[in-house]
Amino acid sequence: MKKVAVYPGTFDPITFGHIDVINKALKLFDKVIIAASDGANKNYLFNSLERVQLIKKALFVDLKFDKKKIEVISFTSLTTDLCKKYKSNIILRGLRAVSDFEYEFQLAGMNRKLNNNIETIFLMSDVENQIISSRFVKEIVRLKGDIKKFTTKSTIKSLKEKYE
């Protein structure tokens, strides 16, 4: 049986931090479902369709990832329901710093209460990616700064178009 992990997030936009976590996950799982959340309580720069396209371009065009091992979707449901749909009991989350852990710990606990078969696996970003956040990347590009150390070429192009 294939081991499938669900990696939910906003990915607004995808960064090298996210990609670092995806790389690590691909070493542990047969397939990774990258699920761009479309939660109502967030203000997104890119809508869910745009974020799915950005992720696909970053992974499959810029970085040449194996399409057979990754599926990119958007979702509006509970993450636990998404896991059920994809026959996965693994939620994958990336951690950058200790400050991320408290929120992620609570989220993992809630998901476990919703479905006691769910395990949340935390993967640490490499040191050079721990400072990267989508929020900072958007702010840097808005102020006309250089973000090539933080995300892929296609994502940079899309970000610049949004801020023109």
From Swiss-Prot:
The keyword tRNA processing does not apply. Substrate binds at residues 10, 42, 79, 93. Pfam families: CTP_transf_like. Keywords: ATP-binding, Coenzyme A biosynthesis, Cytoplasm, Magnesium, Nucleotide-binding, Nucleotidyltransferase, Transferase. The keyword Zinc does not apply. The record marks 18 as: Transition state stabilizer. Its EC number is 2.7.7.3. InterPro entries: Cyt_trans-like, PPAT, Rossmann-like_a/b/a_fold. One of its GO terms (molecular function) is ATP binding. Signal peptide: none annotated. Transmembrane segments: none annotated. Homohexamer. Reversibly transfers an adenylyl group from ATP to 4'-phosphopantetheine, yielding dephospho-CoA (dPCoA) and pyrophosphate. This is Phosphopantetheine adenylyltransferase.
